[in-house]
UniProtKB/Swiss-Prot annotation, chains A, B:
Signal peptide: none annotated. Its cofactor is thiamine diphosphate. Gene3D superfamilies: 3.40.50.920, 3.40.50.970. GO terms for biological process: carbohydrate metabolic process. Keywords: Lyase, Thiamine pyrophosphate. Pfam families: XFP (PF03894), XFP_C (PF09363), XFP_N (PF09364). Its EC number is 4.1.2.-. It comes from the Bacteria. The keyword Lyase applies. It is an enzyme of class 4 (lyase). This is Probable phosphoketolase. GO terms for molecular function: aldehyde-lyase activity. Belongs to the XFP family.
Amino acid sequence: MIETLESTQVSHETLRTIDAYWRAANYLSVGQIYLSDNPLLKRPLRIEDVKKMLLGHWGTTPGQNFIYAHLNRTIKQNDLNMIYVSGPGHGGPAVVANTYLEGSYSEIYPHISQDEAGMRKLFVQFSFPGGIPSHASPECPGSIHEGGELGYSLSHSFGAVFDNPDLIVACVVGDGEAETGPLATAWHSNKFLNPATDGAVLPILHLNGFKIANPTILARINHEELEQLMRGYGWTPIFVEGKDPMKMHAAMAEALDVAIGQIRSIQQNARETGDTSRPRWPMIVLRSPKGWTGPKFVDGVRNEGTFHSHQVPLSDPAKCPEHLKQIEQWLRSYRPEELLDENGRLRQEIADLAPTGDRRMGANPHANGGRLLRRLKMPDFRDYAVEISQRGCRGIGDTHVTGKFIRDIVRLNEEHKNFRIFGPDETISNGLEAVFDVTQRQWNAAIVEDDESLAPTGRVLEMLSEHQCEGWLEGYLLTGRHGLFNCYEAFVHIVDSMFNQHAKWLKVTSELPWRHKIASLNYLLASHVWRQDHNGFTHQDPGFLDVVVNKKAEIVRVYLPPDANCLLSVMDHCLRSQHYVNVVVAGKHPSPQWLTMGEAAEHCAKGIGIWDWAGNESSSDPDVVMACCGDVPTLETLAAVSILREHLPDLTIRVVNVVDLMRLQPKSEHPHGLSDSDFDALFTKNKHVIFAFHAYPWLVHRLTYRRTNHANIHVRGYKEEGTITTPFDMTVLNDLDRFHLVMDAIDRLPETGGRGQRLKALMQEKLVEHRRYINENGQDMPEIRDWEWSARS
Amino acid sequence: MIETLESTQVSHETLRTIDAYWRAANYLSVGQIYLSDNPLLKRPLRIEDVKKMLLGHWGTTPGQNFIYAHLNRTIKQNDLNMIYVSGPGHGGPAVVANTYLEGSYSEIYPHISQDEAGMRKLFVQFSFPGGIPSHASPECPGSIHEGGELGYSLSHSFGAVFDNPDLIVACVVGDGEAETGPLATAWHSNKFLNPATDGAVLPILHLNGFKIANPTILARINHEELEQLMRGYGWTPIFVEGKDPMKMHAAMAEALDVAIGQIRSIQQNARETGDTSRPRWPMIVLRSPKGWTGPKFVDGVRNEGTFHSHQVPLSDPAKCPEHLKQIEQWLRSYRPEELLDENGRLRQEIADLAPTGDRRMGANPHANGGRLLRRLKMPDFRDYAVEISQRGCRGIGDTHVTGKFIRDIVRLNEEHKNFRIFGPDETISNGLEAVFDVTQRQWNAAIVEDDESLAPTGRVLEMLSEHQCEGWLEGYLLTGRHGLFNCYEAFVHIVDSMFNQHAKWLKVTSELPWRHKIASLNYLLASHVWRQDHNGFTHQDPGFLDVVVNKKAEIVRVYLPPDANCLLSVMDHCLRSQHYVNVVVAGKHPSPQWLTMGEAAEHCAKGIGIWDWAGNESSSDPDVVMACCGDVPTLETLAAVSILREHLPDLTIRVVNVVDLMRLQPKSEHPHGLSDSDFDALFTKNKHVIFAFHAYPWLVHRLTYRRTNHANIHVRGYKEEGTITTPFDMTVLNDLDRFHLVMDAIDRLPETGGRGQRLKALMQEKLVEHRRYINENGQDMPEIRDWEWSARS
């Protein structure tokens, strides 16, 4: 069954110890699901010993206990640096049982002690209000992967081993999870791994055959197809299949020895010879029954080996005495008296199977990455400043400027190998081409003549899968490193749900004192909604921000720097920060530059502010506030202000620019929120505010609805109008252009009288002229293309 | 190169015609990218003939033109019913060129006539403001798949062929797209296809080797691995590899004959013998150079066969005369004078290669699915009504009731086979088990003893991939059928981006008179945020609604029925509707029933209304409005009202329930929006409104910020607090529970005085009691579990 010549022998005695360890973990798992008392079954089981609400999942648990016990043996024997990723959902009972058995659980939670009293608490807390969930949740030591949402285990595992040459991640992939898209493409991660400078992932595809109520695809194709699939993905599969425990122990022990042997041999070869060409890494296919060792039948229906074992197999002991009897038989089938001493502690000869100290998978520092976090070395972002010869001078594209800053971050941290850039083939397209001056795209598939910036090692990872980019980066961050995900704004929605889960992970871990803070997850969304000139409607969606701000205020930050110097300041801040999700939206096309570096740093530190030089207010309140957030809205707002000041010189205008979107929220809602008095000082208590916003306009209303002056805030933003057209026409289609903004202001300012109405008429003429011009010429009018900021009043 | 014994011969003459057709399409493609005039090159090319803004994508185009020409020959020869799905992004020039050549384009757009004048317009409109995008956009006849966002071509194709036994979808899969997760798992769709009752998908994996700036993975693994991968996915690959046009024509023609032969033989066998066991369907791997036939070098850098050909190879003819020269040479290399007559019409002997009438891929009715749409036969939803013995009587779980209604829709439409249910293994979990009384899960992988509800044909498709469910359903709807996607609320975020694209597709097609309306995309989100008792925090996310309401108001509808009778009424409405996206959020757990069928139908028709029987107002305005939206918020609101009415009998309370969320928006913003006077009549102009909401609370503010009484609307909803706990405790953690709602009301009603304060103190005690009780018992207090509605005042 095992396809190898280099098999090793594991003694029968060791196999018996593994079996005992497995039984102990199974016992503790069933105990978690069922017992509120009588944890050692010192007396016959009574209904009072059983939890009133039976919640939890058994199906995947015995298989994961089996794997964990075998990994313990292998780690100890080979002194491996290994962590465990539990891909199948609902593996909670297994990882909790095992970290408890190895001692790492009680070290973190001393009240869950390794004795009868602690075991009782261990059982009671599981799936209990105020207790712990049934996944490999953040509360569980050794976990970097929750498993609540399926599909990301392999991506997280690869993220963990990049730049960790000694680390092996044992990644259990559920056969349900394997049907998801993200997992199906994650097998290709092996084309991005360097065997010399990265660690290894050992995938263990766990074919227990069923999901919630269905068989799984990979369990229902024949052996030949499954083997071809894994080989086609570039892996060497080792099959372990069956259900007889002792035969399976022998097969699994041998499979692991073969796999570890192959990993070591691949790594040794690459590291000694420098030959880093892509190896065929080993992986294990473990086919074992769902709900293995659980009840064979429940109420006359087959349970072990079917989807009926997915949750709680015997679900109604209160009403059905037969269930209670079966639960007791099931628990006693593990012969707990052989495994645990009378105080409930695992017998030493069994406990010795597991490694000790930080080699325990529940105590490995890589699984609590903040412990390993080293601050990034950062150049002074001010050194990359754009010279502002005059307000509004044309830059080279804001992200291109930041690209040089990031290039030097790459360079400065080359030694520690703890910074990476991820993107779906868009790092150049997003304007970060400068990084390729100092590094390459890491790529381990074939390289041919004429390829550019591809190499076996490099700081940039590009695969056309936003899921992979996100999953790799999350794994990289969770193991204590730093990184950046650059992505088209519209398509970052592809990872909405992954973002949700990571934000939830950060929220929960921030409340666990033993979890050290990790580096922030930084998104750079260049190629944004307003500049999809050649891509059109499908590439226009600024709604990721709406998804982000739904998450806990302590975790999420959103920045929309208006120019290159502001972007530098913001990126510097984000890359230094910890335990946030930072979303930065910035442009890549040549666009006006407004603030000197000093002004930008000050403006970004405040996150919001009045641009005195753009407005013309005196000491009293202005007549109108022109607010803007985002690079394109800032341009259109300043162009509108320029028109207003020229044509209505008596009007006093205040210009407010927003970089840190969270400043708009009340302080009670977000730590960055402005106090009401500060907000009122900026936006006035009663003047009209014409607000040009980068994203969907109602997001501003959602953030400001409690503010004094909210009824006077009028927001323009993207409203799902667009196609392939000119950059300026995109703003026209969404009423965000300078002409509309001027008209909006006049509509709110009846006191502008006849002059206002004449200016409005002029604006309408301009819009007609614009439409005619682009229809004839396919580009914007010269007065738009060549526009320069001036404040003539 | 072709792996088959049954090869056929295509005459050399035919191959030459195919080549001519291909050259014509290539000529028209390059023309679209470059030319504003001189479409037939009747004079030497001048810079004035070239567009000022050069936008578009060449890289994928010649390969797709190659495929389309070969498909034309095959369709005509075999009288195939075939449509074309363009998976690679930016195949716009190819599909536009080909539908123009075959005549379907000019039939829809008569001004783009098949002559020199029309050709000039065809060229000018491409990637031009007000023109057409560079994808296979909705504007292009024959398209059901835009391709702007990558990854869904195969899923759409399979959706199209379910229940269309005569249809073949030729699906071009880009090798960039093939890296995405959704595409990587979509290959497994063959495990769900019935060769007798469904049609066939012929995937053509187009390995042109490059993405935007990178090679692709599948082009850089060796032949053996690629073949293993495709075989592992269950396909039989046929390889066509090379770059010499005439050799490639011969190979491709033969490959298609083999593939079509295999498809027909598989279908014939299944249909004649009844053996529907899973066949190995054929697929084609076409390896050809990116930018094939384009310039070999540009500015000294290799272009054809590299990623440099991705967009516009010669990008600056205005400044670089050499570019202009090369453009002309490139265009003339296709020898247009051999292909087009002097009026610009394709010569008849070449045009004859293509099929005619509805066999043309641009005219096939399946690609304009509304043409084939047949109304669903619907039973009377009132027949499934829940008897309301008294207000608040406990139901069996709302979706379980609707399950029977849907079961009978399945039954009634069995004959026409135009209704399907899609879900990621959750149809039973979401409460729709009744459908398995009359149908099965369609499944074509192995079936073994003890399997339940699996069969080669069935109306339910379940794969653990939300992407697949969504993609299949979209393909099914786009080809003129009906369906339902049932999904856990939290995990529907996985398809946020697919929803975005489908909503955009619906918006654009609704503006094209020749595009017939299709059935709505219906989501049933059961297993919602408030009832994740055993799944916890990762399964709690009601934010899909925020994503949905960002899209065009004409397209999106959101319903939150409070009980089973309302759910029946809503589902009836949604399944009859066209060209919307309907999102329905409903519960599956036993919960109180409020409205008789008659009341429910009336309430849902209005979408919002006062529940007189719950409040106690007299003719004048009430003291407070207690509003609710969603089943759990409605329960907690009514429980709060019950407490308020008992303890503060002098208080007059109005209860408003919202089913149709869009009613909250102003009429100007959404067609369902209430007028301001109607809104004021419900919510008053100045009374406090305590609003209990299903999702994130700020969504209500976003919808109502323009309303008269907005400042008095106080919303409770999910605020990212939760874990494994009791159902009621979930509401407590988010301040949405009855006790908090009572306290909220009292806080806003100082006139309740000492009695109010005493009630508030009582509520605080209740919360303490609740916390203590669940900590001790792991379940809710009896007074919560056994609560029954009563209005004692």
